[in-house]
Amino acid sequence: MHRGLNLLLILCALAPHVLGPASGLPTEGRAGLDIVHPVRVDAGGSFLSYELWPRVLRKRDVSAAQASSAFYQLQYQGRELLFNLTTNPYLLAPGFVSEIRRRSNLSNVHIQTSVPTCHLLGDVQDPELEGGFAAISACDGLRGVFQLSNEDYFIEPLDEVPAQPGHAQPHMVYKHKRSGQQDDSRTSGTCGVQGSPELKHQREHWEQRQQKRRQQRSISKEKWVETLVVADSKMVEYHGQPQVESYVLTIMNMVAGLYHDPSIGNPIHITVVRLIILEDEEKDLKITHHADDTLKNFCRWQKNVNMKGDDHPQHHDTAILLTRKDLCATMNHPCETLGLSHVAGLCHPQLSCSVSEDTGLPLAFTVAHELGHSFGIQHDGTGNDCESIGKRPFIMSPQLLYDRGIPLTWSRCSREYITRFLDRGWGLCLDDRPSKGVINFPSVLPGVLYDVNHQCRLQYGPSSAYCEDVDNVCYTLWCSVGTTCHSKMDAAVDGTSCGKNKWCLNGECVPEGFQPETVDGGWSGWSAWSVCSRSCGVGVRSSERQCTQPVPKNKGKYCVGERKRYRLCNLQACPPDRPSFRHTQCSQFDSMLYKGKLHKWVPVLNDENPCELHCRPFNYSNREKLRDAVMDGTPCYQGRISRDICIDGICKKVGCDFELDSGAEEDRCGVCRGDGSTCHTVSRTFKEAEGMGYVDVGLIPAGAREILIEEVAEAANFLALRSEDPDKYFLNGGWTIQWNGDYQVAGTTFTYTRKGNWETLTSPGPTTEPVWIQLLFQERNPGVHYKYTIQRASHSEAQPPEFSWHYGPWSKCPVTCGTGVQRQSLYCMEKQAGIVDEGHCDHLSRPRDRKRKCNEEPCPARWWVGDWQPCSRSCGPGGFFRRAVFCTRSVGLDEQRALEPSACGHLPRPLAEIPCYHYVACPSSWGVGNWSQCSVTCGAGIRQRSVLCINNTGVPCDGAERPITETFCFLQPCQYSTYIVDTGASGSGSSSPELFNEVDFDPHQPVPRPSPASSPKPVSISNAIDEEDPELDPPGPVFVDDFYYDYNFINFHEDLSYGSFEESHSDLVDIGGQTVPPHIRPTEPPSDSPVPTAGAPGAEEEGIQGSWSPSPLLSEASHSPPVLLENTPVNPLANFLTEEESPIGAPELGLPSVSWPPASVDGMVTSVAPGNPDELLVREDTQSQPSTPWSDRNKLSKDGNPLGPTSPALPKSPFPTQPSSPSNSTTQASLSPDAVEVSTGWNVALDPVLEADLKPVHAPTDPGLLDQIQTPHTEGTQSPGLLPRPAQETQTNSSKDPAVQPLQPSLVEDGAPTDLLPAKNASWQVGNWSQCSTTCGLGAIWRLVRCSSGNDEDCTLSSRPQPARHCHLRPCAAWRAGNWSKCSRNCGGGSATRDVQCVDTRDLRPLRPFHCQPGPTKPPTRQLCGTQPCLPWYTSSWRECSEACGGGEQQRLVTCPEPGLCEESLRPNNTRPCNTHPCTQWVVGPWGQCSAPCGGGVQRRLVKCVNTQTGLAEEDSDLCSHEAWPESSRPCATEDCELVEPSRCERDRLPFNFCETLRLLGRCQLPTIRAQCCRSCPPLSRGVPSRGHQRVARR
């Protein structure tokens, strides 16, 4: 299980019917079944009742020190057991609401608002044996678990024998079988549904609106997740209606424990506020096998049933559906899905929901996983670097691996995700504490509630039982299904018995009853400031503290408060030639393979999520998110005028003083916190009317702002911008006019606008370098006006900052009278920036804060009253509440001075005492007599006594408190017998694929333990079954199939990013020690058909140069000579054109009608002269001549491979010579070691330019040789680099050449080149120029240049004509369409626009539109969009006002049912003012005494308008006019007085002085005083009407 999931054993025991009826327990799950008859006794063991329901236990006041106790006694195996139990008041809150819904009709909804206090916890005692813990529910008999002599025993009533009045109800007690040790791993899994982009954009937009309210530091605050849990009808059908409630609470308690684990890094409480149990299917909630549809239906349904307002006790923040349906990813398959939720959907009314499939107690991990997705947590390894290492288990792993002895925890990435989610303010709904009516969890360890057999029945059905001696139960739970043992690779839950006096806890078998002590977390000290995240350009340093002193353990509280601080550093700007910080982060991925290739990554800006790292491969448009968060200090918006930077993945605002969230701004000329007094505006007009080309208009200096450049009137001229470098233009340079738009110029953005012929340039600035304004003259200039704002010259030079201490204003006086204290605080000031952080000033020179007294006039006297003391009597007359009353005056904030009562005479004196409990009659008491003798002589008898009500108060005695009149008495034992009732089996089950071991299973015979050789191996990720491993076969009759599956947690996030944006060549072939793609590998024709090989196919595209090893075509039996080929330069014009003049047209320029590269024969390029197409020409290239002798080329290494980079050479034997035949084609060939010419029967078409450097040579005309060389042609194969021609054409043309001569054999034998004699009168001959190689852009033309003698050496090389030159017809232009703009309206019909430009395809330089007119039609620039009808806005109820008075703000949720489909202009307000009335209220005192005992009197009370903030009365009562004025008087004693003749008063009965004092104190109104002092207190006059019937004025 999980470290941190340590459930306190002192809380809930068993809810009613947790274990199910007795008939549902399989006989193999019980041992030692006994029948007992428990009775209720008192603390001393005296009999009280056969009735086990503790009706006398009533829940006392919450402040009661201890709960009521109950005692039970029973005889078990001849031993007398005494149960001492106490009520568990914390299982459910007083306002617990459990709804049972039937047939979707509200009238049939049963709501349980209270539960009986029949859940008891305590211990069992035995005089001899060791007792232990007991958790018993006494709601319907005794049902639960207790420990005796370190063994677990279960007790429950016998259903076959109902309880009889006056008789003890029979119960059965049975032991729980112990299990062996096990060990293995386990897997389980769920998957979150990704949140929609609309939701993410909505959240980001909300975050930006809340920026001003957010603090810069990271604060750890307690969060309360108020949860609605819904159990569907399948759950009720499976578990049974009485049991499902306790089962669900047990699951949710385990989930709450997971979220209390310290590894999550935040104090989060999972609280169930509402539980809905669906006995029938809901009309509006359709639960199907299709997981997506079920989640969608449930999210809609839970939103409708949610209570409005966070303050409602049953309002929930998230909803969880638990179902027994077998969930499937799609309609019918795959069906291994266990859970579904929306990522980052928490607190969203429509998306804060999840669905989980019930598979037994491991359901808790599924619920925790899906709830983690709602917190915005991604799977570990998905978009982050927290992929599970080995088998280290994490809760958010895509496939959870439960390693032995290692509990599930939260990974570092999960902690960062949830912290970022909360710091962004996306969890505002979690800030409010739950109201009354919250459900408390059962905190008994789940293994105590559900033993191993019960856990097996939950997973596999009623007939399943625990397989003993298979593995350690704390690691893996194995259950029987038929004759085999199955396992879902889950460990048994905490509290499961794993041996004698032991249970499982955190994956380990520990002594039973062991519960680690709860330890609350404590903050460590602040760490040192970290290294600055950047060396320039505003970096971030941070200091943080951890909740590690100590680390919270065992349900201890997590630390609350500030956990991280930030400070900016290295504020100086970076060098301009350095790439951006975001670009540097993208380039870190250049060395990583992406789709099988290496790419150069460039950044892509993302305004919706500016702090995520989005990049794309250079020259490709598709983008990828490479990191979830950029490094601290990365600008949020690259290229904009903004200082905002990213910190921990959140965009933080930076003021001009470079303090986070300071709000400091610059004035219009760049002075931080300035008032514009130092700004100077420069305005000039350029009036030269005539000019040629580009003419300077004026210079805008660096630091200029509010720049405006415009033509005075329309003209055909063009504005241009350039830097101080004459060759560097920002706009409209190089005689090219650009389109309207925004252009980056000198560190700022200029907006270029042209309406008709009138041009304007605007920019907010500031410029980082001087910018020249130019005018490109086309006609007469009507004038150009420009202006800008800059700081005055005296302040333009950069000055070092000056920091000093300054006093701020005096604080407000905290009191209105009685002397208060005002303080004057110090601030650190900078001369230009104003108030800055105190760290910039010298602390040694810091002056002291100033103080002074204020409002020293004395406060008026007022009555001070203390708290009411308890009533002096609890019943009957004569009891009083009393309190102290003093006249005091405030002389300070915390000091009061006592005065004489006369000083408060202007105020009515509050009452010092009032009667209490006089209406409560005191109860009577019971009296008891002595016990009689026992009624029997042996065994159990009865003795009696008398019980009487001692009635001396006139109140009957309480029957519930009446003592018993009879009790048991026990003498020497009598013999008696017991009977045993056998029962059937019950439980629950499921059918899902799982790992199982087939075992010859016998429920009555233990399964033998595997031998050490068959110890389990680590679980593999694959599904392969190793059937041949002998170590997997245990000895004896047990055999293990080990069919393993790993799909409990299915990853719904399919990796769609691997779609190729180009062909991926990931398969590589090793050729000659080099790894090359497969499309470059040499071809391999059949070995009996040697084929001459030209350049390797694809070598030109891949840019691969060098020698190619030959295909292994030649065998020792082959008589055909091999042809040696090498790769050649890619471009035939490389020798004639410079790099600047090389043909450039479209992005991939190819020369028309030329096969390139030409065939190469051992480094010599072969071609055919136009005059004689049948000659195979060999180009001389002395630079490629190897220095090694010809014979060295045939040397082989020991393994038979040729040495050196060249191919195998020709054999040394000469070619046989025969006379030439006119019908056969002949070819000259110089058989030097570096050049071989062969007759192929093909015509090779090559670039004519090369023929100037070629010379004809002749090959032998031996038919045998020709047959051998032409073999490839006759068999239909051809070299990849040669172009065949028909044989007829070849033969015809070759017969026309008289210069064809056979080779001399000696030349071939010697291997020497042929020497040709120089010709006389030779001259250069040129052919016609070819057409331009391109139709647009920069191309090339060439011509044939050759010597008339056929040998270039006969002609003068210095006078050789140019064979090629470049040509340029026109620019290659094409329409380039930009991205469509955002639709002007999301619904109701809108339009989107885009920019369409005519550009040069070479460098994407903008051109005038006429360049593209010959081509395709210009693409449209506008299209319709957002045609769907608009939906109405959804508004929630208003939340509680932020202030109780004095003006506050109310908020409500305003959202669109379908994001983007609502009219933005009609969006309702989400805030409104509230409680605008002043902070005053009427305060009333207690009603005074009635002015008359009868005949109509008046009661009066004090009514004052009091300021609730100061606690003082307001002089103006109109300030309380927002409340109804309470009555200050009311009539009383309206009954008529009896007409009794007053007795004659002779004298006062009390002493005269005492009566005079009472009269002065106003006591004569009291009837008793008036009767005792009849002379001093004359009777009331009846002639004057009472003022009690008059309305007293309000003021």
Curated annotation (Swiss-Prot):
Domain-related comment: The spacer domain and the TSP type-1 domains are important for a tight interaction with the extracellular matrix.
Pro residues compositional bias, start-end: 1005-1015, 1079-1089
Signal sequence annotation: 1-20
Cysteine-cysteine disulfides: 299-353, 328-335, 347-429, 386-413, 456-479, 467-485, 474-504, 498-509, 532-569, 536-574, 547-559
Residue interval(s) of motif Cysteine switch: 189-196
PROSITE patterns documented for this protein: ADAM_MEPRO (PS50215), PLAC (PS50900), TSP1 (PS50092), ZINC_PROTEASE (PS00142)
CDD domains: ZnMc_ADAMTS_like (cd04273)
Residues reported to bind Zn(2+): 191, 369, 373, 379
Keyword Metal-binding set for record: yes
Residue ranges occupied by any Peptidase M12B domain in the UniProt entry: 223-434
Location in the cell: Secreted, Extracellular space, Extracellular matrix
Cofactor, free-text remark: Binds 1 zinc ion per subunit.
One Gene Ontology MF term: metal ion binding
Main location: secreted
Glycosylation sites: 84, 105, 619
Assembly notes: Interacts with COMP.
Protein name per its UniProtKB record: A disintegrin and metalloproteinase with thrombospondin motifs 7
Keyword match Metal-binding: yes
Entry superkingdom: Eukaryota
Listed SUPFAM superfamilies: Metalloproteases ('zincins'), catalytic domain, TSP-1 type 1 repeat
Function: Metalloprotease. Was previously shown to degrade COMP. However, a later study found no activity against COMP.
Gene encoding the protein: Adamts7
Catalytic residue list: 370
Region Spacer, annotated ranges: 680-791
Transmembrane segments: none
